[in-house]
Amino acid sequence: MSKDMLVNDGIRAREVRLIDQDGEQLGVKSKIDALQIAEKANLDLVLVAPTAKPPVARIMDYGKFRFEQQKKDKEARKNQKVIVMKEVRLSPTIDEHDFDTKLRNARKFLEKGDKVKCSIRFKGRAITHKEIGQKVLDRFAKACEDLCTIEQRPKMDGRSMFLVLAPLHEK
């Protein structure tokens, strides 16, 4: 339901299909009759389906309805998890200590629930030995396998090879 719904005198249609506060259809009524019925019940006449023939109007407490709608929207936004992709850059000739540091960072990201993209950039003639980069990425994935699943296997993209790891349980 849109935020700018037509209410009471804002409704331009001459006739509306009327639904009361209990959800029962009262049939096609003139706008004036529908407004009078809504006024007697101390409620608002809200146009819920303006494109229908004739348009559908419902008798309800519009203020309460808007409040409930805002609460639902807020709850939906709160439950929405933003997926963050972190990147760890390696090289085909990475030293053991550097590898361990990068691995520790990646494990920290995975524990937080973030995805990790591990990339290796081949410089100069190193591109001729792609299998070395493949081994480094395989070793990296093997070291993290208790925390993650491999979302995308090692793949070449230009002068880079990358692998995407996703956490086992996203928090």
Swiss-Prot record:
Pfam families: IF3_C, IF3_N. It comes from the Bacteria. One of its GO terms (molecular function) is ribosome binding. Transmembrane segments: none annotated. InterPro entries: T_IF-3_C_sf (IPR036788), T_IF-3_N_sf (IPR036787), Translation_initiation_fac3_CS (IPR019813), Translation_initiation_fac_3 (IPR001288), Translation_initiation_fac_3_C (IPR019815), Translation_initiation_fac_3_N (IPR019814). It is found in: Cytoplasm. The keyword Cytoplasm applies. Keywords: Cytoplasm, Initiation factor, Protein biosynthesis. GO terms for cellular component: cytosol; membrane. One of its GO terms (biological process) is ribosome disassembly. Disulfide bonds: none annotated. IF-3 binds to the 30S ribosomal subunit and shifts the equilibrium between 70S ribosomes and their 50S and 30S subunits in favor of the free subunits, thus enhancing the availability of 30S subunits on which protein synthesis initiation begins. Belongs to the IF-3 family. NCBIfam families: infC (TIGR00168). Monomer. This is Translation initiation factor IF-3. The lineage of its organism: Bacteria, Bacillati, Bacillota, Bacilli, Bacillales.
